Amino acid sequence: DVMFSNIMVGRDITKSISMDLGNFSSSYSLLIGIPQGVASAMSASMLPSVVASFTDRDYDSIYDKITKTLKTNMFIAVPSFVGLFIIGQPIIKLLFSRYNSVQGGMMLKIGAIAVVFYTLSTVTSTALQGIDRVNVPMIHSSISLAVHVVLVFVLLKFSALGIYAVVIGNATFPILIFILNLRTLYQEIDYTMPYISVFAKPGISALVMGVFTWLSYKGMYTLTSSNVLALVIAFMVALITYFGPYYALTKMRVFE
């Protein structure tokens, strides 16, 4: 925020700084932070059992617990990402009417993927703590922070992205942490994440959900011109079109 303010002041566009930062801090960060909070809670519950399995040198149990926690978190994070990407703008228009919903919606289109990677980085950081590598996540976060600062500075200084540069930095920050965490888990306990079983079911289900959610919102808004009513219908459609395909794929056991 300080970097953004200083560079934007240098460009003599101070009028929009407060509104841009308010939109980022309130609408974007708050909506992104809700599923992240769920991930933190689930990861915390995983820690004691991973510690117990590591004490017994039961690596198969550790693999199973990490993978199950990743699957559970992706069950929430992936549709959250798709939902914020698809109908982020009308959600902001409803909840944060004082801010520019078009700008906020674009922030979510650019940065909603952070929901997935913050979740992945949180789970893998907890797993590293569970195998007695407590300081490693902090080191990885420091490395990612250094890259983050350089990236945001370059984007702010040499592009016209403005607040979107901060969003890009926020979205890319957890990606490097996750990559470094996963690499260390492989080195320490030979853990390899089963990408297909972790991402396939929520990914396919969320894509189906996204299409029907967008169509239902657009259709209802065209008919009624009511953002609230269109969102209510869209949320109902989202629930049905996500859980339906997910349940079907689970019963088929295609990606197990």
Positions of PLM-derived features:
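Transmembrane alpha-helical segments of multi-pass transport proteins
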Residues: 197-254
